[in-house]
């Protein structure tokens, strides 16, 4: 019996599912299936995105749009967790605190005034983002040099790319803004952010994007998220169809507390991702259904068009055939009319029939192909052409024929030919005073 994750899969999809699991090492079959479905079962794209995810590289198969996503930071339901610095303890602690308070106040006041005045002289170079990816890579290298290579997988792309990938994959995005000059940054990175339990949680359940606020890209994100202190973490997810900050963690937080807070934020907002995933699947199904309906409509339309085309072709074929039959009929009528006119002309041109008493006359009995007989007299001096014209003028005669004598059996040259350009006379042809000639039908030859 197939596992639940493998139900409704074709053999090819099952093979891809097992191959993808072997290549990526993901234990959950359902997670493998979701990854392949997100890439339309494109094995190469799914594996490459999984490798990119492990290295923190944005997807190369789904480039982000040119316009960055807007993040909703004005939601009053944002979960905020702030860790304040511990209060001084004992008389010595309070004494040191009170002595340093005026100096600290003066230092930060002068520093703020200096920075404010400097803006009028020279704009903050961090406000111009020229190489955002370079800022991320530079921070990642400096982080590894200072805190080691054991850390959560950095997303090696811009903030906008991270937002787009988190939205596309329906995952949580954890943003870390690093304050280089803050006194708690080093301790947080070494003890909390690089803790094995924290690394495992972040790598398995969310995307992780980080940058220093001293970098233009980090400064730009800082202006959008408006952190109050460092270390600063913001949890962002797709909520109500907008990328929204759902949690803010500020201050020096301990590893266990960090894990608890991140888990709490994810558990509290997991229903939104589930709801969005269901809505997305419903939209995809609706889109697939609409596409199938469109394809069915187009197929029906093409079938109707093909049927209409064949109908027009059949109608045109019948029209051409009827026109051809009509033309043949007209041509046959013209031919018959021309033949009849030719018969009448031949009849009018025949010389008069000699009298029976004329010694130079020849009595010829013609036996026609329809077994009828015709008798007429001709003069010995007349050409055999006269005999042919007489027979041609008869209504019973075929259109094409030849005249044959029986004793001896021969064909009389009644029409001009290469052998007989001028047909002979009856006398030259050797006809006697009384002859029986046979008319041979040549119409079908």
Curated annotation (Swiss-Prot):
Q: Name one Pfam family in it.
A: UBX
Chain residue ranges for the region called Disordered: 300-361
Please provide, alphabetically and separated by semicolons, the GO molecular function terms listed in this UniProt record: lipase binding; lipase inhibitor activity; protein-macromolecule adaptor activity; ubiquitin binding; ubiquitin protein ligase binding
The cellular component terms of Gene Ontology attached to this UniProt record, alphabetical and capped at eight, are: endoplasmic reticulum; lipid droplet; VCP-NPL4-UFD1 AAA ATPase complex
In the record, N-acetylalanine modifications are located at: 2
Q: Entry's SMART domains?
A: UAS (SM00594)
Q: Where is the composition biased (Basic and acidic residues)?
A: 303-348
Whom does it interact with, and what assembly results? Answer: Identified in a complex that contains SEL1L, OS9, FAF2/UBXD8, UBE2J1/UBC6E and AUP1. Interacts with YOD1. Interacts (via N-terminus) with UBQLN2 (via C-terminus). Interacts with PNPLA2. Interacts with ZFAND2B; probably through VCP. Interacts with LMBR1L and UBAC2.
**In its UniProt entry, what is this protein called?**
FAS-associated factor 2
């Amino acid at each position: 019996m197939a596992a639940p994750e493998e139900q409704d899969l074709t053999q090819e999809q099952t093979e891809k599912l097992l191959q993808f699991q072997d290549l990526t090492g993901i234990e959950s079959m359902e997670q493998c299936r979701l990854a392949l479905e997100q890439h339309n079962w494109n094995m190469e794209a799914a594996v490459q995105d999984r490798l990119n995810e492990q290295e923190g590289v944005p997807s190369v198969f789904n480039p982000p749009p040119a316009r960055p996503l807007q993040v909703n930071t004005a939601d009053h339901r944002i979960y905020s967790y702030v860790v304040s610095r511990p209060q001084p303890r004992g008389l010595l602690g309070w004494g040191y605190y009170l002595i340093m308070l005026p100096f600290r106040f003066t230092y930060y006041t002068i520093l703020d005034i200096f920075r404010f005045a400097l803006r009028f002289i020279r704009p903050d170079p961090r406000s111009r983002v020229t190489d955002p990816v370079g800022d991320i890579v530079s921070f990642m290298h400096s982080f590894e040099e200072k805190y080691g290579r054991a850390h959560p997988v950095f997303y090696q792309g811009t903030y906008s790319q991270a937002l787009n990938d988190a939205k596309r994959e329906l995952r949580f995005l954890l943003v870390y803004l690093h304050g280089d000059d803050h006194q708690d940054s080093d301790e947080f990175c070494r003890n909390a952010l690089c803790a094995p339990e924290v690394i495992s949680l972040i790598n398995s359940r969310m995307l992780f994007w980080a940058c220093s606020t001293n970098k233009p890209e980090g400064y730009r994100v800082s202006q959008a998220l408006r952190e109050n202190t460092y270390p600063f973490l913001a949890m962002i997810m797709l909520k109500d169809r907008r990328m929204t900050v759902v949690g803010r963690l500020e201050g020096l937080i301990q590893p266990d507390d960090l894990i608890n807070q991140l888990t709490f934020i994810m558990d509290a907002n997991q229903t939104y991702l589930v709801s969005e995933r269901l809505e997305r699947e419903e939209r995809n199904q609706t889109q697939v259904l609409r596409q199938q309906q469109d394809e069915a409509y187009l197929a029906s339309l093409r079938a109707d068009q093909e049927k209409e085309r064949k109908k027009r072709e059949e109608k045109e074929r019948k029209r051409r055939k009827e026109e051809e039959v009509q033309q043949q009929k007209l041509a046959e009528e013209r031919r018959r009319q021309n033949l009849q006119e030719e018969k009448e002309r031949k009849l009018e041109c025949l010389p008069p029939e000699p009298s029976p008493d004329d010694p130079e006359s020849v009595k010829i009995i013609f036996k026609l192909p329809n077994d009828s007989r015709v008798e007429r007299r001709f003069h010995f001096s007349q050409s055999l052409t006269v005999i042919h014209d007489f027979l041609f003028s008869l209504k019973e005669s075929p259109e094409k024929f030849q005249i044959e004598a029986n004793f001896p059996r021969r064909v009389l040259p009644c029409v001009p030919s290469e052998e007989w350009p001028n047909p002979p006379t009856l006398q030259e042809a050797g006809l006697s005073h009384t002859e029986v000639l046979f008319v041979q039908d040549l119409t079908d030859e």
